[in-house]
From Swiss-Prot:
This is Large ribosomal subunit protein uL22. Belongs to the universal ribosomal protein uL22 family. GO terms for cellular component: cytosolic large ribosomal subunit. SUPFAM superfamilies: Ribosomal protein L22. The keyword RNA-binding applies. Part of the 50S ribosomal subunit. One of its GO terms (molecular function) is rRNA binding. CDD domains: Ribosomal_L22.
Length: 112
């Protein structure tokens, strides 16, 4: 049985969040939480929140034991990009792309 949590439209670049997601994929839930607590990346706080939600979904919706859960899948998809103008010299302008992410974490029971 698997439980899933998704955070959508998070205002951080998918590339930055993938660096954090790669650290926890396949790990046990408690180990993943410990890794996220000490990871000095901005995305680690958001990923920790999604992981906590996935564990809560597993406990509440499927009556699974949190100590027996593992991060079976974790991935980041690109959300819509906000395009903003940044003024430059001589009347020119550059486009600033403010990227968003959709973060998905799926937890399942350990296979013996």
């Amino acid at each position: 049985m698997e439980a899933k949590a998704v955070a959508r439209y998070i205002r951080i670049s998918p590339r930055r969040v993938r660096q954090v997601i790669d650290l926890i994929r396949g790990k046990g839930v408690r180990e993943a939480e410990a890794i996220l607590m000490v990871t000095p990346k901005r995305g680690s706080r958001v990923v920790a929140k999604v992981l906590k939600s996935a564990v809560a979904n597993a406990e509440h919706n499927y009556d699974l034991d949190a100590s027996n859960l593992v991060v079976s899948r974790a991935y980041v998809d690109e959300g819509p990009t906000l395009k903003r103008y940044q003024p430059r010299a001589m009347g020119r302008a550059n486009i600033r792309r403010k990227r968003t992410s959709h973060i998905t974490v799926v937890v399942g029971e350990k296979e013996d």
